[in-house]
Design a protein with these regions (language model features):
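Beta-strand/loop-rich accessory regions of lumenal/periplasmic or secreted enzymes
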Residues: 1-139
Length: 139
């Protein structure tokens, strides 16, 4: 979701593989942003990874391809995938807007220059250390 489309999204606790966080558009384009996230965990098949939380909330997207690979592809099958996790952690994300077929984004949603205060906390974990309960209490 993005600032101008978040009202259509459900708030909840989700467990999804990275591949499920993307939308397979006919013409590859930026996608998969998660908006106003409280915390997120990223881990491998051995349950080794890290937990991140933001103060205040944060946005993230996670893919197995880089922004450059996405930009260079003209069709989904041309995206060059990688084994690594490509993670974008953001204080805020710009609105989508729809100026090509509708109005500009609302002014209040635009990110404007200025001072801001933001912090992120990271905590590594291994094996069974992370479960549904510790996800909410580890940081």
């Amino acid at each position: 979701a993005y600032p101008d489309s978040k009202e259509a999204q459900k708030v909840g606790y989700y467990k999804l593989p990275v591949e499920a966080l993307s939308t397979n558009y006919t013409y590859p384009q930026e996608n998969g942003n998660r908006h106003e996230v409280r915390r997120a965990a990223f881990y491998d098949d051995k349950m080794c990874g890290f937990l991140v939380s933001g103060a205040p909330l944060f946005d993230f997207s996670a893919h197995h391809y880089t922004a450059q690979a996405l930009e260079e592809a003209k069709h989904p099958h041309e995206i060059e995938y990688c084994d690594e996790l490509v993670l974008n952690l953001n204080w805020k994300s710009a609105p989508l807007g729809s100026n090509s077929c509708g109005p500009l984004p609302e002014d209040k949603l635009l990110i404007k220059p200025g001072d801001f205060k933001f912090s992120m906390n990271f905590r590594g974990f291994a094996g069974a250390e992370l479960d549904d309960k510790t996800f909410f209490t580890m940081i």
